[in-house]
């Protein structure tokens, strides 16, 4: 299984999820590289399992002006995971079906409780028609080749 975090660059910048604690420095370095000096506006937290959320506090230390986007259950869990983290004035609580406009990208949040944990939500980017699926559709193991390589081979 691979654990991915994504950056959506538009008029506003959103980072989708964080990564496992074992990859903190590598991940923060890659995020900084992709941002190229820009500051993220939002950190979208779809799932609080540590392999997705372990670096929320580290991210907020690196980018303290970022707003965290999550649902009520996620924020409750976050407060228990990161007891010393102060998100006062930095929370954007979403309900099922809410949207967030980044510019041309519009994100829609869909709750998916018990896909894995009770707070899970997925995020649909209607511009690129991409579903950020948290732990949905996950599979352990790794492909020997990339998915795009497989699809290219199938269409020939």
Which role does the model predict for each range below?
Residues 11-13, 98, 105-107, 128, ...:
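Well-ordered beta-strand scaffold positions
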Residues 48-53, 76-77, 116-117, 138-141:
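Active-site environment of divalent metal-dependent phosphoester hydrolases
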Residues 70-120:
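Metallo-beta-lactamase
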Residues 11, 22-69:
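Active-site metal-binding motif and surrounding structural segment of the metallo-beta-lactamase
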Residues 1-35, 122-125, 129-133:
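Conserved beta-strand hairpin/beta-sheet module of binuclear metal-dependent hydrolase folds
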Residues 131-147:
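Short, solvent-exposed beta-strand-terminating loops
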Residues 148-155:
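Conserved small/polar residues in nucleotide/adenosyl-binding loops
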